[in-house]
């Protein structure tokens, strides 16, 4: 998410500068802990006492079949392609140099709280990406769709998301979802709208430091484009908010 990635990178750079000043090192460490705790708490918010566990769907080798793609149970052989996909979208590529980081990413994709299916091409079974519900234990189910760059621009994302939503409703009876999209990610916005997603305001993403975010918005006014102004109007928010927030699309199938 380009805008919010830039926000988080700016915050981390600021903390790195503080860490270089020994007098403020403790304050920076506390701030880093705060950011980490916020990410963890985001995963814990609004968790239901009971939820649909998708146990039946997770056991299905083939979840759904479309005209050009199929949605399948994740396979161990998908791991390398999934990691490649994460590298293509990484804001901190050096993290992949850390021991165990790739295992952590793959483990998160296969976690019991996630319902994730691989998107595969029908003709040759090639891995293209994935569709998922990020946390099935939440009361507000968030969608995620990512495809390898080589498959961008062919309508596969729209096909995959449509098939995913229709199939979930058919099997589980669930028909309400949301998706978070960066204000500069026009292709994902078009995909959401083509699949029936409706603009529904904005949301904070990872960083929740309101004072810092307001300062960032003021200092980066020059980053606001005419296109961002049009998008902000569609979502009924001030353009500068797209520098620090993500767009929310809601789906009712």
Language-model segments: which ranges?
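Cytosolic beta-strand hydrophobic patch enriched in CBS
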Residues: 115-121
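Acyl-donor (CoA/ACP) binding surface of acyl/acetyltransferases
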Residues: 2-17, 30, 34-80, 85, ...
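Conserved GNAT-fold acetyl-CoA-binding loop/helix
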Residues: 87-107, 115
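Short secondary-structure boundary/capping segments within folded domains
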Residues: 73, 108-109
């Amino acid at each position: 998410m380009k805008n919010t990635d830039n926000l988080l990178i700016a915050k981390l750079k600021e903390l790195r500068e503080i860490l270089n000043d020994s007098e403020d090192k403790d304050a920076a460490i506390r701030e880093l802990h705060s950011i980490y705790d916020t990410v963890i708490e985001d995963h814990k918010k609004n968790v239901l006492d009971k939820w649909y566990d998708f146990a039946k769907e997770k056991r299905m080798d083939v979840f759904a079949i479309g005209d050009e793609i199929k949605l399948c149970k994740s396979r161990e052989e998908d791991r390398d392609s999934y990691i490649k996909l994460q590298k293509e979208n990484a804001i901190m590529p050096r993290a992949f140099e850390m021991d165990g980081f790739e295992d952590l990413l793959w483990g998160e994709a296969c976690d019991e709280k996630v319902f994730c299916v691989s998107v595969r091409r029908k003709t040759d079974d090639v891995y293209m990406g994935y569709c998922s519900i990020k946390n099935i234990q939440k009361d507000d189910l968030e969608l995620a769709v990512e495809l390898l760059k080589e498959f961008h621009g062919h309508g596969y994302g729209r096909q995959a998301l449509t098939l995913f939503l229709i199939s979930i409703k058919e099997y589980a009876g669930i028909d309400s979802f949301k998706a978070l999209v960066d204000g500069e990610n026009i292709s994902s916005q078009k995909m959401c709208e083509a699949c029936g997603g409706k603009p529904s305001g904005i949301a904070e993403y990872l960083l929740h430091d309101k004072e810092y975010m307001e300062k960032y918005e003021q200092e980066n006014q020059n980053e606001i484009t005419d296109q961002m102004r049009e998008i902000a109007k569609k979502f009924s928010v001030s353009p500068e908010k797209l520098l620090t927030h993500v767009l929310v699309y809601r789906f009712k199938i």
